[in-house]
Amino acid sequence: MVHGPPPDRRWGQWVRLALGPASALGLARFAYGLLVPAMRTELHWSLAQAGTLTTANSLGYLLGAVAAAPVARLLGVAVTFRLGMVLTAAALAVNAATGRGYAALLVIRLVAGLAGALVFITAGVIASRAAARARSAAPLTICFAGAGLGIAISGTVLPPLLGHHPGRWPLGWGVLAAAAGLATIISWTAAEGGRERGTAGAVIHLRSVALLWPVALAYLLFATGYVAYITFLSAYLADHHAGVGQVALTWALLGLAAVAAPALWSRPISAWRGARALAALLAGLSAASALALVTTAPAAVAGSAIGYGVTFLGVPAAITALNRAAVAPRDWTGTLAAFTVVFAAGQTAGPYLAGALADRYGTGATLAWTAALCGAGAVISAAIRPPASASLGQD
């Protein structure tokens, strides 16, 4: 009889693995929103220019998602995870040293997105294998909660650091790089469950996207909309003269809510029929974004951040569950790959479009953008009928 590691050791491994999403998403992607006000002021950017850096990061994520399978086949899942962690920390460090060169910043944000995709995808593979061995969803829940941890840490540290000193933005990137480097060291052995090489890459099933077009459209609207809120939230608060304490508390609450989200939504996503969970998540996102538009009173902004944090990471999980229910098992991976392309396309276009809109109508337009697109996605999702069977991929 083969025995796995002791329970305490397994939990320790799962927590350390969660530092992958914490670094790849929380630090390297979403924390940029905290730096936008300082960089915009110091570098005299338009909001469209600020949004384009998120667009570059999202494009890098798409490239990384495409590259993850062949790289994992070549190097192994564990090595790919570690490589992604090192590249993520390095990209953040180079961000700190680049200076004012806009083109260089775009390239580095693209590299950070690519590295982040390698980390997030391989962490998911390792966590999935751990979940199968443990016969528990805990490894997956803990792993994906890591993104919220990275957001909470960033939100606690960066606002006091930058404060009324926008010229410190390179130091902000340096702090994120140091945190990502520490996460790399701590998580290094957490990839032990991913030594084996990956299996053959999946064929992207565009046919499934066509047959599941209402789900794909809702996902596209979410991807195009959600990213505007977290990219421009700090800029919106700065324009409304929010204090450092309010900004820090807002981001900390958003991150902690995101940590709790996987455990909160796992049962509804698996138990509710059809797209009810997806509709509820998107409706919650829309309402949370709109709340901060009504008033910038601290209580309302805090409620908005909590509502956003507790919903936005649940949408990809709900999409995954819908796809698994609608297509044959042999087509799961290819269908999810196709939906990843849909998601990446939306979140690549969204930040620039929302930023350009905000340049004309003010930073509040970015929150309205999120509320409108996610609200439209909720309406579409509410009309989706439950699949009769997992038959799309069958002859």
Give the role of each language-model region.
Residues 108-147:
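Cytoplasmic helix-loop-helix junction between adjacent transmembrane helices
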Residues 64-77, 261-273, 358-359:
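Helix-to-loop junctions at the C-terminal end of transmembrane segments
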Residues 101-104, 133-192:
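Helix-loop-helix hairpin linking two adjacent transmembrane segments in secondary transporters
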Residues 327-363, 367-370:
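A late C-terminal transmembrane helix in Major Facilitator Superfamily
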Residues 275-319:
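C-terminal transmembrane helical hairpin of 12-TM major facilitator-type secondary transporters
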Residues 32-33, 211-252, 259:
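Extracytoplasmic gate region of multi-pass secondary transporters
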Residues 79-93, 276-291, 371:
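Structural signature of the two symmetry-related core transmembrane helices
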Residues 63-99:
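Conserved MFS/SLC helix-loop-helix module at the cytosolic interface between two early adjacent transmembrane helices
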